[in-house]
Amino acid sequence: PKRDSKNYHDSPLLGFRSQLDERIWWTQLSLNFISGTARGVKDLSAFRYYKLKERFPKLNDNFCDANKSYLNKYADRNPENGAKFFGSTTAFVATTDLWHLSQFINHTTMFVSMIIPLYPSYDRRLNWKEIAGRYATIIGANAIGYHWAYDKQFRF
């Protein structure tokens, strides 16, 4: 049977009021899992690149190894020569190496997931238990994504 806002179950922990509300929550969880995964990849490229290289031997060290790739934003990979191209040290730095790309994905997905619930109009506000429940599950999804990327995929 199709559920709508009139007969939808009212979750005491998360406060779902409609299928749309539940879909928004699942979207937030998914975005935060991606965010956590990107954060894990970023930290791997900075602190345990050798594990990434073991798993993916064809990785380009100049793009993926944070100890080398930060030079990609500079002309001839030399900071004294200035930016490699317009925005390579500012607005477009995410295109220069894996660390910055992962950070961009981490921040973008996190911010988008926080903005999503601001737009639908609801007939009532969430109570403190519902807010705490949603916050806990969303932060949990981010932590699971990080743990999955940083620890589980590259066992230490």
Go through each PLM region and give its residues.
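Cationic, hydrophobic amphipathic alpha-helical membrane-interacting segments
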Residues: 3-156
